[in-house]
Protein backbone atom coordinates (compact mmCIF):
# COMPACT_ATOMS: atom_id res chain seq x y z
CA UNK A 1 0.00 0.00 0.00
CA UNK A 2 1.32 3.45 -0.92
CA UNK A 3 2.30 5.42 2.17
CA UNK A 4 0.79 8.87 1.67
CA UNK A 5 2.54 10.25 4.72
CA UNK A 6 5.92 10.24 2.99
CA UNK A 7 6.56 12.02 -0.31
CA UNK A 8 10.04 12.63 -1.63
CA UNK A 9 10.94 15.64 -3.73
CA UNK A 10 11.82 13.29 -6.59
CA UNK A 11 8.36 11.72 -6.40
CA UNK A 12 6.76 15.15 -6.43
CA UNK A 13 8.77 16.30 -9.40
CA UNK A 14 7.81 13.25 -11.43
CA UNK A 15 4.17 13.75 -10.53
CA UNK A 16 3.89 17.48 -11.05
CA UNK A 17 6.68 19.74 -12.16
CA UNK A 18 8.48 18.02 -15.02
CA UNK A 19 5.33 16.35 -16.28
CA UNK A 20 3.46 19.63 -16.51
CA UNK A 21 5.90 22.07 -18.06
CA UNK A 22 6.69 23.82 -14.79
CA UNK A 23 10.09 25.50 -14.59
CA UNK A 24 12.07 25.29 -11.35
CA UNK A 25 13.08 28.77 -10.17
CA UNK A 26 14.82 27.74 -6.95
CA UNK A 27 14.63 25.21 -4.15
CA UNK A 28 10.92 24.51 -3.64
CA UNK A 29 9.90 27.03 -6.31
CA UNK A 30 8.24 26.53 -9.70
CA UNK A 31 6.56 28.67 -12.32
CA UNK A 32 4.29 27.73 -15.19
CA UNK A 33 4.87 30.62 -17.62
CA UNK A 34 2.04 32.47 -19.33
CA UNK A 35 1.28 30.68 -22.60
CA UNK A 36 0.93 33.75 -24.81
CA UNK A 37 4.33 35.07 -25.78
CA UNK A 38 2.79 38.04 -27.62
CA UNK A 39 0.28 39.07 -24.95
CA UNK A 40 -0.35 42.82 -25.11
CA UNK A 41 -0.47 43.12 -21.33
CA UNK A 42 1.58 41.52 -18.60
CA UNK A 43 0.23 38.26 -17.19
CA UNK A 44 -1.88 38.05 -14.06
CA UNK A 45 0.22 36.21 -11.49
CA UNK A 46 -1.39 33.51 -9.33
CA UNK A 47 0.58 32.30 -6.30
CA UNK A 48 0.13 28.88 -4.71
CA UNK A 49 1.78 28.12 -1.35
CA UNK A 50 1.20 24.54 -0.26
CA UNK A 51 2.84 21.43 1.21
CA UNK A 52 4.56 19.61 -1.65
CA UNK A 53 6.86 17.72 0.72
CA UNK A 54 6.38 16.57 4.30
CA UNK A 55 3.71 14.51 6.10
CA UNK A 56 0.69 15.99 4.28
CA UNK A 57 2.28 16.39 0.85
CA UNK A 58 -0.43 14.13 -0.62
CA UNK A 59 -2.86 17.00 0.05
CA UNK A 60 -0.63 19.86 -1.06
CA UNK A 61 0.29 18.12 -4.29
CA UNK A 62 -3.40 17.64 -5.11
CA UNK A 63 -4.03 21.34 -4.41
CA UNK A 64 -1.18 22.39 -6.70
CA UNK A 65 -2.57 20.06 -9.36
CA UNK A 66 -6.02 21.65 -9.09
CA UNK A 67 -4.50 25.11 -9.50
CA UNK A 68 -2.58 24.00 -12.57
CA UNK A 69 -5.73 22.46 -14.08
CA UNK A 70 -7.86 25.56 -13.51
CA UNK A 71 -5.24 28.07 -14.64
CA UNK A 72 -4.83 26.08 -17.86
CA UNK A 73 -8.60 26.06 -18.35
CA UNK A 74 -8.75 29.82 -17.79
CA UNK A 75 -5.91 30.44 -20.24
CA UNK A 76 -7.49 28.12 -22.82
CA UNK A 77 -10.67 30.22 -22.51
CA UNK A 78 -8.78 33.46 -23.19
CA UNK A 79 -7.37 34.30 -19.77
CA UNK A 80 -8.81 37.00 -17.53
CA UNK A 81 -9.45 40.57 -18.68
CA UNK A 82 -7.68 39.65 -21.92
CA UNK A 83 -4.51 38.76 -20.01
CA UNK A 84 -2.90 35.34 -19.60
CA UNK A 85 -2.40 33.80 -16.17
CA UNK A 86 1.00 32.76 -14.87
CA UNK A 87 1.16 30.23 -12.02
CA UNK A 88 3.82 30.45 -9.29
CA UNK A 89 4.14 27.56 -6.84
CA UNK A 90 6.05 27.48 -3.55
CA UNK A 91 6.56 24.47 -1.30
CA UNK A 92 5.56 25.24 2.29
CA UNK A 93 7.09 21.85 3.17
CA UNK A 94 4.89 21.19 6.23
CA UNK A 95 7.27 23.55 8.04
CA UNK A 96 6.18 27.04 9.09
CA UNK A 97 9.66 28.61 9.15
CA UNK A 98 10.42 27.31 5.66
CA UNK A 99 7.00 28.43 4.48
CA UNK A 100 7.41 32.04 5.59
CA UNK A 101 10.59 32.40 3.56
CA UNK A 102 9.06 30.79 0.50
CA UNK A 103 5.88 32.86 0.69
CA UNK A 104 8.02 35.99 0.76
CA UNK A 105 9.40 34.89 -2.61
CA UNK A 106 5.88 34.94 -4.04
CA UNK A 107 5.29 38.45 -2.70
CA UNK A 108 8.67 40.15 -3.09
CA UNK A 109 10.34 38.33 -6.00
CA UNK A 110 7.42 37.16 -8.11
CA UNK A 111 4.98 39.96 -7.18
CA UNK A 112 1.92 37.73 -7.46
CA UNK A 113 -1.56 39.27 -7.54
CA UNK A 114 -2.98 36.79 -5.03
CA UNK A 115 -1.90 33.84 -2.91
CA UNK A 116 -3.93 30.70 -2.31
CA UNK A 117 -2.74 28.00 0.05
CA UNK A 118 -1.84 26.69 3.43
CA UNK A 119 -3.39 23.48 4.74
CA UNK A 120 -3.01 23.33 8.52
CA UNK A 121 -4.19 26.25 10.62
CA UNK A 122 -0.72 26.65 12.08
CA UNK A 123 0.52 27.14 8.51
CA UNK A 124 -2.18 29.71 7.78
CA UNK A 125 -1.30 31.61 10.94
CA UNK A 126 2.39 31.57 9.99
CA UNK A 127 2.00 32.86 6.44
CA UNK A 128 -0.98 35.22 6.64
CA UNK A 129 0.98 38.20 7.97
CA UNK A 130 3.71 38.00 5.28
CA UNK A 131 0.93 37.85 2.68
CA UNK A 132 -1.78 40.19 3.95
CA UNK A 133 -0.18 42.69 6.35
CA UNK A 134 3.39 43.08 5.17
CA UNK A 135 2.81 41.84 1.63
CA UNK A 136 -0.47 43.72 1.07
CA UNK A 137 -1.70 40.84 -1.10
CA UNK A 138 -5.03 39.03 -1.25
CA UNK A 139 -4.98 35.63 0.49
CA UNK A 140 -7.41 32.72 -0.04
CA UNK A 141 -7.29 29.88 2.50
CA UNK A 142 -8.90 26.74 1.01
CA UNK A 143 -8.96 24.21 3.84
CA UNK A 144 -11.64 23.17 6.31
CA UNK A 145 -10.65 24.73 9.61
CA UNK A 146 -11.62 25.73 13.15
CA UNK A 147 -13.18 29.12 12.37
CA UNK A 148 -12.59 32.57 13.88
CA UNK A 149 -10.28 33.77 11.09
CA UNK A 150 -11.56 37.28 10.40
CA UNK A 151 -8.43 38.98 9.04
CA UNK A 152 -9.23 41.56 6.33
CA UNK A 153 -8.22 40.45 2.82
CA UNK A 154 -8.15 36.79 3.94
CA UNK A 155 -10.98 34.74 2.41
CA UNK A 156 -11.83 31.19 3.54
CA UNK A 157 -13.34 28.74 1.05
CA UNK A 158 -13.37 25.52 3.09
CA UNK A 159 -15.93 24.33 5.65
CA UNK A 160 -16.14 25.73 9.19
CA UNK A 161 -17.16 24.01 12.46
CA UNK A 162 -20.78 25.07 12.04
CA UNK A 163 -20.88 23.53 8.58
CA UNK A 164 -19.22 20.32 9.74
CA UNK A 165 -20.79 19.85 13.18
CA UNK A 166 -24.32 21.27 13.39
CA UNK A 167 -25.93 18.44 11.41
CA UNK A 168 -23.17 15.82 11.64
CA UNK A 169 -22.95 15.47 15.42
CA UNK A 170 -26.71 14.87 15.89
CA UNK A 171 -26.35 12.18 13.18
CA UNK A 172 -23.47 10.62 15.14
CA UNK A 173 -25.50 10.55 18.34
CA UNK A 174 -28.38 8.88 16.50
CA UNK A 175 -26.13 6.44 14.62
CA UNK A 176 -23.35 5.90 17.14
CA UNK A 177 -24.23 6.84 20.67
CA UNK A 178 -24.00 9.58 23.28
CA UNK A 179 -20.56 8.94 24.80
CA UNK A 180 -17.83 10.78 22.87
CA UNK A 181 -14.05 10.80 23.10
CA UNK A 182 -12.09 13.66 21.50
CA UNK A 183 -8.52 12.41 20.81
CA UNK A 184 -6.67 15.24 19.13
CA UNK A 185 -3.44 16.52 17.63
CA UNK A 186 -1.97 19.33 19.70
CA UNK A 187 -2.35 22.39 17.50
CA UNK A 188 -4.86 25.15 16.90
CA UNK A 189 -7.43 23.40 14.66
CA UNK A 190 -8.31 20.53 17.06
CA UNK A 191 -8.31 22.77 20.14
CA UNK A 192 -10.73 25.28 18.64
CA UNK A 193 -12.88 22.77 16.75
CA UNK A 194 -13.34 20.75 19.93
CA UNK A 195 -14.73 23.76 21.79
CA UNK A 196 -17.45 24.00 19.15
CA UNK A 197 -17.97 20.23 18.88
CA UNK A 198 -18.33 19.87 22.65
CA UNK A 199 -21.11 22.49 22.70
CA UNK A 200 -23.00 20.68 19.93
CA UNK A 201 -22.49 17.28 21.58
CA UNK A 202 -23.76 18.47 24.96
CA UNK A 203 -26.65 20.53 23.56
CA UNK A 204 -27.87 17.39 21.79
CA UNK A 205 -27.78 15.22 24.91
CA UNK A 206 -24.33 13.73 24.38
CA UNK A 207 -21.38 13.52 26.76
CA UNK A 208 -17.65 14.11 26.25
CA UNK A 209 -15.97 11.34 28.24
CA UNK A 210 -12.50 12.78 27.66
CA UNK A 211 -10.58 15.22 25.48
CA UNK A 212 -6.82 14.68 25.01
CA UNK A 213 -4.05 16.25 22.93
CA UNK A 214 -0.94 14.54 21.55
CA UNK A 215 2.26 15.60 19.77
CA UNK A 216 1.84 15.66 16.00
CA UNK A 217 4.41 12.89 15.54
CA UNK A 218 3.00 10.50 18.18
CA UNK A 219 2.32 6.99 16.85
CA UNK A 220 1.74 4.96 20.04
CA UNK A 221 -1.80 5.41 21.34
CA UNK A 222 -2.10 2.34 23.57
CA UNK A 223 -3.08 4.30 26.68
CA UNK A 224 -5.69 6.29 24.75
CA UNK A 225 -7.13 3.14 23.20
CA UNK A 226 -7.35 1.53 26.64
CA UNK A 227 -9.17 4.58 27.96
CA UNK A 228 -11.65 4.47 25.07
CA UNK A 229 -12.38 0.78 25.59
CA UNK A 230 -12.57 0.91 29.40
CA UNK A 231 -14.94 3.89 29.33
CA UNK A 232 -17.20 2.22 26.76
CA UNK A 233 -16.98 5.21 24.41
CA UNK A 234 -19.56 5.14 21.60
CA UNK A 235 -18.05 7.69 19.19
CA UNK A 236 -14.39 8.58 18.66
CA UNK A 237 -14.48 12.12 17.22
CA UNK A 238 -10.91 12.17 15.94
CA UNK A 239 -8.67 15.11 15.09
CA UNK A 240 -5.34 13.25 15.18
CA UNK A 241 -3.66 13.83 11.80
CA UNK A 242 -0.94 12.04 9.78
CA UNK A 243 1.43 10.48 10.62
CA UNK A 244 -0.32 9.46 13.85
CA UNK A 245 -3.85 8.82 12.60
CA UNK A 246 -3.05 5.57 10.77
CA UNK A 247 -1.45 3.84 13.77
CA UNK A 248 -4.19 5.20 16.05
CA UNK A 249 -7.03 3.77 13.97
CA UNK A 250 -5.18 0.47 13.57
CA UNK A 251 -4.67 0.18 17.33
CA UNK A 252 -8.35 0.97 17.95
CA UNK A 253 -9.38 -1.72 15.47
CA UNK A 254 -7.07 -4.30 17.03
CA UNK A 255 -8.55 -3.52 20.46
CA UNK A 256 -12.03 -4.39 19.16
CA UNK A 257 -13.54 -0.90 19.12
CA UNK A 258 -15.37 -1.38 15.82
CA UNK A 259 -16.28 -5.01 16.49
CA UNK A 260 -17.97 -3.93 19.71
CA UNK A 261 -20.11 -1.33 17.93
CA UNK A 262 -17.96 1.79 18.21
CA UNK A 263 -18.19 4.55 15.62
CA UNK A 264 -15.19 6.41 14.20
CA UNK A 265 -15.76 9.99 13.08
CA UNK A 266 -13.27 12.34 11.43
CA UNK A 267 -14.30 15.52 9.62
CA UNK A 268 -11.21 15.75 7.40
CA UNK A 269 -11.35 12.14 6.20
CA UNK A 270 -11.73 11.91 2.43
CA UNK A 271 -10.70 9.55 -0.39
CA UNK A 272 -7.00 10.30 0.12
CA UNK A 273 -7.02 9.40 3.80
CA UNK A 274 -9.20 6.31 3.29
CA UNK A 275 -6.08 4.62 1.98
CA UNK A 276 -3.94 5.22 5.06
CA UNK A 277 -5.46 2.13 6.70
CA UNK A 278 -6.79 -1.19 5.52
CA UNK A 279 -10.50 -0.83 4.74
CA UNK A 280 -11.52 -3.15 7.58
CA UNK A 281 -9.71 -0.97 10.13
CA UNK A 282 -11.96 2.03 9.44
CA UNK A 283 -15.18 0.35 8.31
CA UNK A 284 -18.11 2.59 9.23
CA UNK A 285 -16.00 5.72 9.74
CA UNK A 286 -18.21 8.77 9.26
CA UNK A 287 -17.09 12.07 7.77
CA UNK A 288 -18.79 15.36 6.90
CA UNK A 289 -17.39 17.29 3.94
CA UNK A 290 -18.40 19.50 1.04
CA UNK A 291 -17.67 16.79 -1.54
CA UNK A 292 -17.20 13.05 -1.93
CA UNK A 293 -16.26 11.31 -5.17
CA UNK A 294 -19.41 9.17 -5.01
CA UNK A 295 -21.35 12.35 -5.93
CA UNK A 296 -20.06 11.95 -9.48
CA UNK A 297 -22.67 9.21 -9.91
CA UNK A 298 -25.49 11.73 -9.50
CA UNK A 299 -24.04 15.11 -10.46
CA UNK A 300 -22.75 15.63 -14.03
CA UNK A 301 -20.65 18.66 -13.08
CA UNK A 302 -18.89 16.75 -10.31
CA UNK A 303 -18.26 13.96 -12.79
CA UNK A 304 -16.80 16.50 -15.23
CA UNK A 305 -14.41 17.97 -12.63
CA UNK A 306 -13.32 14.54 -11.44
CA UNK A 307 -12.74 13.23 -14.96
CA UNK A 308 -10.70 16.29 -15.96
CA UNK A 309 -8.52 16.01 -12.87
CA UNK A 310 -7.94 12.27 -13.24
CA UNK A 311 -7.06 12.70 -16.92
CA UNK A 312 -4.44 15.35 -16.14
CA UNK A 313 -3.17 13.79 -12.90
CA UNK A 314 -3.67 10.04 -12.75
CA UNK A 315 -2.16 8.34 -9.74
CA UNK A 316 -2.00 8.71 -6.01
CA UNK A 317 -2.82 12.37 -5.34
CA UNK A 318 -6.59 12.46 -5.43
CA UNK A 319 -9.10 15.28 -5.92
CA UNK A 320 -10.64 15.22 -2.45
CA UNK A 321 -12.28 17.61 -0.01
CA UNK A 322 -10.33 16.92 3.18
CA UNK A 323 -7.12 17.67 1.30
CA UNK A 324 -8.40 21.19 0.41
CA UNK A 325 -8.61 20.33 -3.30
CA UNK A 326 -12.29 21.34 -3.40
CA UNK A 327 -11.59 24.53 -1.46
CA UNK A 328 -8.78 25.28 -3.91
CA UNK A 329 -11.15 24.80 -6.85
CA UNK A 330 -13.86 26.90 -5.19
CA UNK A 331 -11.41 29.61 -4.18
CA UNK A 332 -9.90 30.02 -7.64
CA UNK A 333 -13.31 30.08 -9.35
CA UNK A 334 -14.70 32.64 -6.88
CA UNK A 335 -11.55 34.72 -7.38
CA UNK A 336 -11.99 34.45 -11.16
CA UNK A 337 -15.57 35.72 -10.84
CA UNK A 338 -14.38 38.60 -8.65
CA UNK A 339 -11.65 39.64 -11.10
CA UNK A 340 -14.15 39.64 -13.95
CA UNK A 341 -16.54 41.83 -11.97
CA UNK A 342 -13.81 44.19 -10.75
CA UNK A 343 -12.24 44.57 -14.18
CA UNK A 344 -8.84 44.90 -12.51
CA UNK A 345 -6.57 42.86 -10.22
CA UNK A 346 -5.57 45.28 -7.46
CA UNK A 347 -6.24 43.93 -3.98
CA UNK A 348 -8.98 46.34 -2.90
CA UNK A 349 -11.02 46.01 -6.09
CA UNK A 350 -10.87 42.22 -6.17
CA UNK A 351 -11.59 41.92 -2.44
CA UNK A 352 -14.68 44.12 -2.80
CA UNK A 353 -16.01 41.89 -5.58
CA UNK A 354 -14.96 38.66 -3.87
CA UNK A 355 -16.94 39.70 -0.80
CA UNK A 356 -20.17 38.74 -2.59
CA UNK A 357 -18.89 36.41 -5.33
CA UNK A 358 -20.91 33.35 -6.34
CA UNK A 359 -20.39 30.31 -8.54
CA UNK A 360 -23.36 28.37 -9.90
CA UNK A 361 -21.39 25.13 -10.12
CA UNK A 362 -18.50 23.68 -8.16
CA UNK A 363 -17.46 20.55 -6.27
CA UNK A 364 -20.54 19.33 -4.43
CA UNK A 365 -22.69 22.15 -5.79
CA UNK A 366 -22.87 25.94 -5.97
CA UNK A 367 -21.13 28.25 -3.51
CA UNK A 368 -21.27 31.87 -2.49
CA UNK A 369 -19.36 34.18 -0.21
CA UNK A 370 -21.29 35.64 2.73
CA UNK A 371 -21.04 39.44 2.34
CA UNK A 372 -18.92 41.02 5.04
CA UNK A 373 -17.85 37.65 6.47
CA UNK A 374 -15.15 36.42 4.04
CA UNK A 375 -16.44 32.86 4.40
CA UNK A 376 -18.35 30.65 2.02
CA UNK A 377 -21.78 29.03 1.99
CA UNK A 378 -21.74 25.53 0.48
CA UNK A 379 -23.54 22.21 0.50
CA UNK A 380 -22.43 19.60 3.03
CA UNK A 381 -22.58 15.81 2.94
CA UNK A 382 -22.29 13.06 5.55
CA UNK A 383 -20.70 9.85 4.29
CA UNK A 384 -19.70 6.51 5.78
CA UNK A 385 -16.75 4.33 4.75
CA UNK A 386 -17.85 0.95 3.41
CA UNK A 387 -15.41 -1.51 1.87
CA UNK A 388 -12.83 1.16 1.07
CA UNK A 389 -15.28 3.65 -0.46
CA UNK A 390 -17.79 6.20 0.78
CA UNK A 391 -21.56 6.03 0.81
CA UNK A 392 -23.60 9.22 1.24
CA UNK A 393 -25.96 8.90 4.22
CA UNK A 394 -26.98 12.54 4.69
CA UNK A 395 -26.90 15.90 2.94
CA UNK A 396 -27.72 19.50 3.78
CA UNK A 397 -30.90 21.18 2.69
CA UNK A 398 -29.34 23.83 0.48
CA UNK A 399 -26.24 25.90 1.19
CA UNK A 400 -25.02 25.87 4.79
CA UNK A 401 -24.02 29.14 6.47
CA UNK A 402 -20.47 29.15 7.90
CA UNK A 403 -21.58 31.28 10.90
CA UNK A 404 -18.26 33.11 11.08
CA UNK A 405 -17.06 36.68 11.62
Question: Across the structure, where does each feature detected by a protein language model lie?
Answer:
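N-terminal secretory signal peptides
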Residues: 1-34
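Extracytoplasmic "Venus flytrap"
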Residues: 47-66, 90-96, 119, 183-191, ...
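Beta-alpha junction/loop-to-helix N-cap segments that form part of ligand/metal-binding clefts
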Residues: 58-65, 78-148, 157, 215-221, ...
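Extracellular/periplasmic periplasmic-binding protein-like sensory domains
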Residues: 252-329, 396-402
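Segments of small-molecule ligand-sensing domains
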Residues: 311-326, 332-392
Amino acid sequence: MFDRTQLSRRRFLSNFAFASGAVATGVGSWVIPAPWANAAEAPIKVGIATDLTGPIAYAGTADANVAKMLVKQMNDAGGLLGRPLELYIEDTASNESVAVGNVRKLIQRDKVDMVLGGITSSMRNAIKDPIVARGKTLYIYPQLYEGKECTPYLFCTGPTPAQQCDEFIPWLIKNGGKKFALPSANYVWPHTLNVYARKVIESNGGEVVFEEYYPLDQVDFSSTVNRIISNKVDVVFNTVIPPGVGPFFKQLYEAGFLKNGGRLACVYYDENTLNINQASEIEGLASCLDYFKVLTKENPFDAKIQAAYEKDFPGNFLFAAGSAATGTYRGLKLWEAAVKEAGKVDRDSVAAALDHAKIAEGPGGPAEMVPGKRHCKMKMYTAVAKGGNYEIVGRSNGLVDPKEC
